[in-house]
Amino acid sequence: MSKLSERNLKFETKQLHIGQETADPVTDARAVPIYATTSYVFHNSQHAADRFALKDAGNIYGRLTNPTEDVFEKRIAALEGGTAALAVASGAAAVSYALQALAKAGDNIVAAKTIYGGTYNWLEHTFSEYGVTTKFVDPDEENAFENAIDENTKAVFIESLGNPNSNIIDIEEVANIAHSHKIPLVIDSTFATPYLLRPFEYGADIVIHSATKFIGGHGTALGGVIVESGKFDWAASGKFPQFSEPNASYHGAVFTEAAPGAALVTYVRAILLRDTGATLSPFHAFMFLQGLETLSLRVERHVENALKVVDFLSKNPKVENVNHPSLPDSKYNALYKKYFPKGAGSIFTFEIKGDAETAKKFIDHLEVFSLLANVADVKSLAIHPASTTHSQLSEAELAEQGIKPNTIRLSIGTENIDDIIYDLQEAFDSLDD
């Protein structure tokens, strides 16, 4: 009989077992233990020295590794089809670490301008202070990515489903463009989850998630994760000496040699996480493992409910427009069919007939929906992006991202669909008062 780890397991089985195929070797506990420890005992002085020199893989200090986090990292890497993963303290930390690892002062990133407002703001206003500029392009414009890349571009960055309008970019096409310039495609796939989309299958090289969202699923823990495909040849590219040449802080260790197929993830852990410490809590790692165990079940219900809400809104006379790629008249419908046969998540926007005050009045009359800044919770959520999540953007930037004063973002939960639609209808009816 083959070992469980050697079998070609299906997604629903992997989300329960990978990383801990047998009971805990010390206690025989079936659940993954929470290892609440800051540090680890070395066998002897040589063992300690080898660990610090990256000659022997294993735990050194809690800022870098933790056994609970290790199970979570292995499981999410397996679900994405990657070679390695690194869990960190938030989705924002995952994005910033991945791009900081790739680009240095004088370099640039090419990014879709339809990304999450917080990421846009970090790239435009914060990362630029460190000498890394970002060229934001319209992903719907022909040759936009190709035309923006130059000799100093170190990555292309997109989202699998744009936040908040759920726009879709042709991942395969953009990956080919990036690879023709010997640079990686980095994709934030938070809204899709590995259950709906595995970007590595279409040529992406680095996948990022805010684990706070669907992975955790219950709005109870903050975290992020970086997953590496293992397919991008950092050495052959010639553009990433930080991975392929000796590192002075590790006495000449070369990450592409020390960690084949996981050079970027290892670099982020050994350098950036070591030095800046956005470490994931072991307790949050445990909660994310709990979330992963029901990921496919929850996402199926999220998608089912979302499609029914989209249908309801698209027929409502008080709705100006619904932004969801499943709609036949959506310009993203062909890409939706290509990349999302199981559905495109449950986060999308619509424009209500009226102005910003109309949108806010509608939101303020919702009761099943919660007004808060998170998404991808089992509870349904609503927010007015222009005055909250994307409020740091200028009017011009909001317009470029397709966010209008009357735009409302919904995150459809797993409640009974009748209760969700009733709540929305009650809010629409309140506009007549």
Language-model regions, residue ranges each:
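Short hydrophobic/aromatic beta-strand micro-patches
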Residues: V227, T349-E351, S411-G413
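Conserved small-domain helix->loop->beta segment predominantly found in fold-type I
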Residues: T276-T279, F283-A285, Q290, T294, ...
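N-terminal glycine-rich, Lys/His-bearing helix-loop that initiates the first secondary-structure elements
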Residues: M1-D56
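Conserved N-terminal alpha-helix of the aminotransferase class I/II PLP-enzyme fold
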Residues: N44-A93, G118-H125
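PLP-dependent enzyme catalytic core of the Aspartate aminotransferase-like
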Residues: S2, E124, T133-T134, E151, ...
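Glycine-centered tight turns that cap/initiate beta-strands
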Residues: G81, N152, K318-N321, V368, ...
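Conserved PLP-enzyme active-site core in the AAT-like
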Residues: L4-R7, Q15, G19, A23, ...
